[in-house]
Amino acid sequence: MPLSRRDFAKLSALSLAARFASPLSAQAPNKKIGYAVIGLGRIAGHFLPAAAMSTNSEITALVSGHPDKAARIAAQYNVPSTSIYNYENFDQIAHNPAVDAVYVALPNSMHAEYTIRAAKAGKHVLCEKPMSLNVSEAEQMIAACKAANVKLMIAYRCHYEPTNLKAVKLIRDGALGQVQAIESAFGFNMGPNEWRTNKKLAGGGPIYDVGIYSLNACRYLTGEEPEHIQANISTIDHDPRFVEVEENTSWTMKFPSGIVASCSTTYGANMPGYFRVYGSKGWLQVDNAFVYEGLHLRAEFGDTKIDELNPARDPSHFVAEAEHFSHCVQNNLQPQSPGEEGLKDMQYIAQIYKTASV
């Protein structure tokens, strides 16, 4: 029985409502959560309009090394010039009452520094993934936020996206029977001179940037943590783009229930992000699973067939993400993707490199 668009919307809304559920004693205040956006690159270009579109968030400060760009964006979002900071005077943000939280949208190598500095300034932190360069940095970020009594959320936007949530619900409800295996991949053909090929800035190759989506998806789809990881890493034909970081990574993960996940990521080819889950009673697949729009869920189990294209458009993922974190700040709740979630992925990435002998 195919699910109607109305059924899809209803299920998605219920899933999101469960994500945002709060204790009966919590009452959401009217005040919007003010964000300082740290870094004004590509990813910030999605978050800025999303926060403005959300019901409980707003942009109240900007942090950038490019004053002209910052001034232009500030004018778009009614941010006063006194709330534009650079990386040197960032700590003065502690004295800005309009800033409740920061969104860290910087290269990976800067995540730990600005998360810790923001925490010391008394601001809650929404940090882009990957959380950090390594396990040690992730642990320091968590410790700093706990010491300052501020919240830390890692921006795993797929945790708040309706199609991903629907896939999780179908699995949890047993629609596919016992899950046996998962396949997932995500990659793109990267141009030359990208900061992502600089190991000091990126931490490593595609596993840090796009492969982490497959890694994290296998964890939230199964609801389990992998107990065994095996990986291979390669660079094809001595490609000059990949002197410092690897081009390709493939790995398998075995989970306690016996589920085996097979994943691949690359910077050397366009590999549309997807995951496919095989169960004893059926299967499901989400194409474009990790991009900003065009997510397509297909599934077959029993007499049921699903073929649903999510009509939502960018920046809907970022709206849901911002609203969730702001809701948690307003109501003193633990985010669904806290620092500990990011730490686990950093631990598994370390295992991937170790088993690949890198």
Labelled PLM ranges:
Residues 2-3, 7-29, 101-103, 327-358:
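C-terminal helix-rich "cap/oligomerization" subdomain common to oxidoreductases
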Residues 37, 86, 127, 152-154, ...:
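Hydrophobic residues in well-ordered beta-strands that form the structural core
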Residues 101-108, 112-159, 174:
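Beta-strand-loop-alpha-helix segment that lines the small-molecule cofactor/substrate pocket
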Residues 287-358:
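C-terminal active-site/capping subdomain that shapes the small-molecule cofactor and substrate pocket
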Residues 82-88:
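Conserved SAM-binding strand-loop segment of SAM-dependent methyltransferases
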Residues 39, 151, 158-242:
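Predominantly a Rossmann-like dinucleotide-binding segment in NAD(P)-dependent oxidoreductases
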Residues 216-293, 319-333, 350:
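Contiguous beta-strand/loop segments that form the cofactor/metal-binding neighborhood of enzyme cores
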Residues 11-78:
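N-terminal Rossmann-like dinucleotide-binding module
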